[in-house]
Amino acid sequence: MDALATVTYPGTKKNLVESEMVADNLRIDGMKVSFSLIFPRDTDPFMKSTIKAAEAAIHYHVSKDVEVTIEVETKSKPRPEAGKMLPGVKNIIAVSSGKGGVGKSTVAANLAISLARLGYKVGLLDTDIFGPSMPKMFGVEDFRPYAVHKDGRDLIEPVEKYGVKLLSIGFFVNPDTATLWRGGMASNALKQLIGDADWGELDYFVLDTPPGTSDIHLTLLQTLAITGAVIVSTPQKVALADACKGIDMYRNDKVNVPILGLVENMAWFTPAELPENKYYIFGKEGCKNLAKEMDVPLLAQIPVVQSICESGDDGKPAALNVDTMTGQAFINLAISQVVHSYNMRSEKSLCVL
C-alpha cells in the first residue's frame, strides 16, 4: 500500500490510496501480488497509464521480481446522454480549419478571451487530443485540474485564466511524448473532458477543434448541440481548398451546423515600424472571395504581426491588449459572434412559433 501511495491519479492531488481507488481485495502470496483498482468509469482514458504506474511503483519500492496482477473495477454515476450534456451552456462555437498551421488555435484562444472581456461567461475546450496547444497559449502548462464532488459525481474542475474556463488533454499527458491512441480512446477522452467536467453556467463554449475532418469532429457533432462553426483559413489557395471541405462537412445534411463565417488569418504582413503598410505575402483577399462564393460572412481579417506569435508563445494572447490592431480585430470578431449567435437563437424561436 505504501508503494501505491506514491502514485497520483491524473486530475487529482490525491494518490491511489487516498482516492480509495485500491480495492480491499489485496492479496500477497510470496512474490505474487494481486488487487483491483477502482476507476470512476469504464472508459477512463487514464486507466492504462495508471495501471502501468502502479506496477512500476511496486517494482521500484518492493522488488522488480514481484509478479503483479491488477484487475479493473468501475463504479460511477452514468454520464448524461449525448445531446443532454452541458445544459448550462447557451452557445457552443466550433472553431475549425481544413488545414493545420493556419492559426486556428490562435483564433480560438483570442476569441474566447475577447468574449470574456466583453463580460460573458466563457469556456474553452482544446479538443485536439493529439496536438494540444492551449496550455502553452494560456501560460498554464504546469497547472493540473483537480476533481470536485458534485451532484453525486466526481467532476474535473477546469483551469481558469483570463476569465476563461479551460480544459485540454495537455494537462494530463506528458508534453514531450507523442499521444499514441486509437480513435476510440481519443473520443472517450474527449467525452470525459466534456461530460465529466464542472463547466457550470456558460454564455459561450468555444471548441478548438483539430485541423481537417476526423473522428474527433464526429464525436463533437454527436455529443453536443453546436450553435455554429467558425472556419479559419489563410488566403492561400491550398488552404482555401481545405476550408471548403470544412464548410461542406458542417453543411452536410446529416450534420447541419450553421456556418457563422470565415476568418482570414495571416491576411497581410504589417511590420511594427510601418503599421500603415500591408504586404500580401500569402495572397490577397482569398477568404473574402471564398466567403462570397460560399455565401457566408467574412468575420475578420487578422494580419501577420510579430506580437501575435510572441504573445501566444509567452502565454499572453493578443486579445489581452485591445489597444493594438490585432487586439481590436479579435474584439470585433467576438462582437460578431455575439450578433450571429443571437440571430441563430432568434431564428430557432421563430421556427418554434
Model-derived segments and their meaning:
Residues 18-21, 26-96, 335, 345-353:
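Extreme N-terminal, non-catalytic leader segments
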Residues 115-176:
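Phosphate-binding loop that captures ATP/GTP phosphates
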Residues 4, 22, 89, 100, ...:
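Residue-level signature of catalytic and energy-coupling elements of molecular machines
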Residues 144-149, 169-185, 191-219:
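Switch II (G3) loop of P-loop NTPases
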Residues 312-326:
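C-terminal boundary of histidine-terminating zinc-finger modules
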Residues 52, 203-204, 210-310:
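Conserved catalytic-core segment of NTP-binding enzymes
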Residues 92-128, 262:
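Walker A/P-loop phosphate-binding motif and the immediately C-terminal alpha-helix
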Residues 101-110, 132-133, 209-217, 240-242:
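Short glycine/serine/threonine-rich phosphate/pyrophosphate-binding segments
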